[in-house]
Amino acid sequence: MASWLQIPKNSPFSLANIPFGIISSAKITSPVAAVAVGDYALNLSIFASSGGFSQLPVIQPHLGVFSQPTLNAFAALGRPVHRQVREYIQSVFRADTPFPQILKDNSTLQKEALLPLSEVTNHLPMHIGDYTDFYAGLNHAYNVGVLFRGPENALQPNYKHLPVGYHGRASSVVTSGTPIRRPNGQILANPAANPKVPTFSPCKRLDIELELAAFVSKSNELGKPVSIDEAEDHIFGVVLMNDWSARDIQAWEYVPLGPFNAKNFATTITPWVVLLDALEPFRTAGLEPGNRESLLPYLREKRELNAYDIPLEVEITNAGGKPTLISRTNAKNLLYSFPQMLAHHTITGCNMNTGDLLGSGTISGKENQTQGSLLEQTNGKNPLKLADGSERLFLEDGDTVVLRGMAGTEGNYVGFGDCVGTILPALKLEF
């Protein structure tokens, strides 16, 4: 899809994408809605107030949503509106645009509304009321299960019957680039000791988790589940996510109710929300068909293809060092889709709200260096080597982690942008 705007061929934000986000800048002090196009952000607030949407009647009554500090109001308008807005913006930027007067030949509006991405500050795209993290990465679940329970009992009996999940902490979800403070907590230094007595210490086994996450658009009433056939229309779009994890804190605390402090200190997401329509060309088979007979009817999708073919990668750069690519995997390594997660989450009548976030769970392949966590790669025993020769079992202070995901071909990539976090030392606490 050719554009009159110069878009780098390797940009994750080609015209095939058009992801939505929230930005501010030196000139725009209040956060507003935007879309990313190549190396630019289009300020949708200025675009809307300057007649940019004059050829799109469906959005006329709702132009105020683009001046809000979150995308919640826009997301709540529903998928048909999202689709028309995205397609309209694509048509405005096309080389053969039917509306050249809107932006292509409007140098004044270009100067006001098109901002270099290097000059904008990204904010969380949505107000996140609740955050649920699932465990749909079958290979990750198996790999970790083998480490703790052996191959015969790696997966719990419920795993292939329902999307396992837990309620995370919405308040500590941060946007890419936010520094991550190493957590302090209770750690069992010697698991073989008897009696087992913890110590208080900075986390020594700080890890990453490579995930996708989906934002809810349409809410449902309390007591009324979202059916599997309707669930996709309740999803706004997808981001890349790093669910930072304190493995040693988790090992001591997680029985019997699961992770708590080990997961609540930070979760990083990319700031640009990629709409489901942009991902649709990459729909593919997941680890098992979405319509498999082994699922109970409320989870059984009508179609077999229930995943997206999106290459993913993990990179670590130590302080003063060079980047090291430690993992390549693919988003199709999931057992459940986001519609299945949403249908399961609401089957009890749980009401979801616009802006709620659903994490996929860690995405890993079966081969070495396709894992989405350090725990799987090193088991805390077998270090991986960085480019400068240093070794890692888990993350050290000063390490910068970058997650990336991008599908498609040169000139038409659909990607999320970088998901970045740098580890800061733990606070020194005295009691």
Curated annotation (Swiss-Prot):
Region feature Disordered, mapped onto this chain: 362-382
Entry annotation: catalytic residues: 140
Residues where Mg(2+) binds: 243, 263, 267
Cofactor: Ca(2+); Mg(2+)
EC number: 3.7.1.2
Gene3D superfamilies: Fumarylacetoacetase, N-terminal domain (2.30.30.230), Fumarylacetoacetase-like, C-terminal domain (3.90.850.10)
Pathway recorded for this protein: Amino-acid degradation; L-phenylalanine degradation; acetoacetate and fumarate from L-phenylalanine: step 6/6
Any one GO molecular-function label of the UniProt entry: metal ion binding
Protein family (similarity comment): Belongs to the FAH family.
This protein's name: Fumarylacetoacetase fahA
Organism: Aspergillus fumigatus (strain ATCC MYA-4609 / CBS 101355 / FGSC A1100 / Af293) (Neosartorya fumigata)
